[in-house]
Design a protein with these regions (language model features):
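Oxidative protein folding and maturation machinery
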Residues: 1-148
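Generic detector of well-ordered secondary structure
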Residues: 74, 97, 176-179, 186
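Short, conserved, surface-exposed binding loops centered on an aromatic residue
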Residues: 128-130, 156-160, 191-193
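Active-site lining segments that contact anionic ligands and/or coordinate catalytic metals
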Residues: 135, 161-164, 195
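Conserved helix-loop functional segments at active or binding sites
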Residues: 144, 172, 186, 190
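Short active-site neighborhood of thiol/selenol oxidoreductases, capturing the structured segment around
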Residues: 150-184
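Structural microenvironment flanking redox-active thiols in thiol-disulfide oxidoreductases
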Residues: 178-197
């Protein structure tokens, strides 16, 4: 039942009819489909984005200049650039790589360098911060056994050899951080974690 619905949800909608864009029906159908009918994981949503976009291209028959094509693409782009659930930003990255960066957008969009530079900048910030993707290497202070020791040079995070690496980002003005950091420090000093590196 799920597979049938997923593949036939838009069967009775003429995806080539741009008049639908002037009604609330089409956008609410898109939101219902991507929010409620599909599993909320990138592996389920990404193929359906491509399936829908290809179907619109065939039915609208105007290439990348079609209004249904671009309005649907833009709606999905806006929906997933700030997703509700962690991990769904992979969909935004996929849309950027497959459609915007490869030029599968209307010429007026592709030629708008200010807009394209802005969204490419957003893409560049997100592409290495996805779940399951290696983070950009970080340059770190090399410290002695005690944090009060003098600075001992620089190292890269990728050069740290350990089974586990815990990176803890905190703010000096954070009240909760002021309480929890001494507990982390105590846990590190008194347990086997220090011996294991």
């Amino acid at each position: 039942k799920y597979t049938y619905m997923k593949n036939h949800y838009f069967d009775n909608i003429n995806l080539g009819d741009e008049r639908l864009l002037r009604t609330p029906v089409y956008e609410s159908k898109l939101d219902d489909y991507f929010d409620k009918q599909l599993f909320q994981i990138p592996d389920s949503i990404i193929p359906q984005v491509d399936f829908l976009m290809n179907r619109i291209l065939k039915q609208e028959n105007k290439g990348y200049e079609g209004k249904m094509y671009y309005n649907t693409l833009h709606h999905l782009f806006m929906k997933y650039q700030n997703p509700k659930y962690m991990g769904l930003d992979n969909i935004f990255v996929h849309i950027m790589e497959t459609y915007y960066i490869n030029g599968h957008v209307p010429a007026r969009v592709a030629n708008d360098t200010a807009y394209m530079n802005k969204i490419k900048d957003r893409y560049a910030k997100m592409v290495h911060n996805q779940i399951g993707v290696n983070a950009v290497d970080m340059l770190l202070y090399k410290m002695g056994q005690d944090t009060l020791d003098e600075h001992m040079g620089w190292t890269r995070l990728s050069l740290v050899k350990s089974n586990y690496i815990v990176l803890y980002f905190w703010d000096t003005d954070c009240g909760h951080c002021k309480k929890i950091i001494p507990e982390w420090h105590k846990l590190y000093r008194e347990n086997e974690f220090k011996k294991k590196g």
